[in-house]
Amino acid sequence: MEYHPDLENLDEDGYTQLHFDSQSNTRIAVVSEKGSCAASPPWRLIAVILGILCLVILVIAVVLGTMAIWRSNSGSNTLENGYFLSRNKENHSQPTQSSLEDSVTPTKAVKTTGVLSSPCPPNWIIYEKSCYLFSMSLNSWDGSKRQCWQLGSNLLKIDSSNELGFIVKQVSSQPDNSFWIGLSRPQTEVPWLWEDGSTFSSNLFQIRTTATQENPSPNCVWIHVSVIYDQLCSVPSYSICEKKFSM
């Protein structure tokens, strides 16, 4: 058997070469795996970011859709309300038979509908056939009389027990104040007279006197709560004006 040293070297070199090739391939595989591992995280991060962006866009789309629906509904409600308001204005602008009757008979409006179509001026109170003003200006009896005249009225004249009850109810809410009425006399020895010249009847109410030795001549009358007194005409007080009207 011949010995071939070159073949041995080839075998040895071949083996060695193959060994080196195997190691080289192993290193390349390891490097490839490391490279793929290193490249993986950026792609995952990008995928997560894209997912979040998609979710945000979806939420925005839902919100915008909801707002659009709400605006559409509110717009339709506004148009509907405007329609009813315009219809109400048309109805109120058209006079009816009842409104014409109320304008002719104002007291009917007060009694039946409560609408303020009163023949009385502002701040006056209507009762039966008269308007009343409870003036809060302090004046003597003569000054109060002039004030009522300037307003086209007279100081109060009480004609009935019902009217007296109405006046008492009004002044009782001001227990610290007294109010001049249209009852006076020129001197102590003569009867009491209303402003229209008619004589006072004690059957309606009694006049309590405040006469004293110092003030012997109280020739004017005022009402305090539910009691009617004579008083010096020069004493400042409030007053009640009355204006009658035809039914």
Swiss-Prot record:
Ranges in a coiled coil: none
TM regions (residue ranges): 45-65
Tissue: Highly expressed in peripheral blood leukocytes and dendritic cells. Detected in spleen, bone marrow, lung, muscle, stomach and placenta.
All ranges on the Extracellular side of the membrane: 66-247
Post-translational modification: Phosphorylated on tyrosine residues in response to beta-glucan binding.
Motif (ITAM-like): 15-18
Record-listed (1,3-beta-D-glucosyl)n binding positions: 146-153, 195
C-type lectin domain residues: 127-242
Keyword Ribosomal protein: no
Bilayer topology annotation: Single-pass type II membrane protein
Gene Ontology cellular component terms for the protein in this record: cell surface; cytoplasm; membrane; plasma membrane
Matching CDD domains: CLECT_NK_receptors_like
Glycosylation sites: 91
GO biological process, one term: innate immune response
Location of the protein in the cell: Cell membrane
Signals that turn on the gene: Up-regulated during differentiation from monocytes into dendritic cells.
Entry function: Lectin that functions as a pattern recognizing receptor (PRR) specific for beta-1,3-linked and beta-1,6-linked glucans, which constitute cell wall constituents from pathogenic bacteria and fungi.
Assembly and interaction partners: Homodimer. Interacts with SYK; participates in leukocyte activation in presence of fungal pathogens. Interacts with CD37; this interaction controls CLEC7A-mediated IL-6 production.
Disease per record: Candidiasis, familial, 4: A primary immunodeficiency disorder with altered immune responses and impaired clearance of fungal infections, selective against Candida. It is characterized by persistent and/or recurrent infections of the skin, nails and mucous membranes caused by organisms of the genus Candida, mainly Candida albicans.
Protein name: C-type lectin domain family 7 member A
Lineage: Eukaryota, Metazoa, Chordata, Craniata, Vertebrata
